[in-house]
Curated annotation (Swiss-Prot):
NCBIfam families assigned to the protein according to its UniProt record, in alphabetical order: DUF167 family protein
Coiled-coil region list: none
UniProt-recorded name of the protein: UPF0235 protein LBJ_1240
Name of one Pfam family that matches: DUF167
Family note: Belongs to the UPF0235 family.
GO CC terms in record: cytoplasm
């Protein structure tokens, strides 16, 4: 399963929200430095969707705010 995520690093609030266009917006406290925000995004997806982190990977957009996430079955 693949889906698009918009990330808001350095956020005061942490949230996981589905948008009308089918994408997901995730706000994390971690900065977009050295992959910290990416790790937080994977942790947030894992917690919200109740799937192991090892099954989640960022397919594209590792250095941008718009990312494509893939979840292995």
């Amino acid at each position: 399963m693949k889906f698009t995520v918009r990330v808001k690093p350095n956020s005061k609030k942490i949230f996981f929200r589905k948008e009308e266009d089918g994408s997901v917006t995730i706000a994390v406290r971690e900065p977009a430095l050295e992959g910290k925000a990416n790790e937080a995004v994977i942790e947030t997806i894992s917690r919200e969707m109740k799937i192991p982190k090892r099954k989640i990977r960022i397919v594209s957009g590792e250095k941008g705010k718009k990312k494509t996430i893939e979840i292995d079955p």
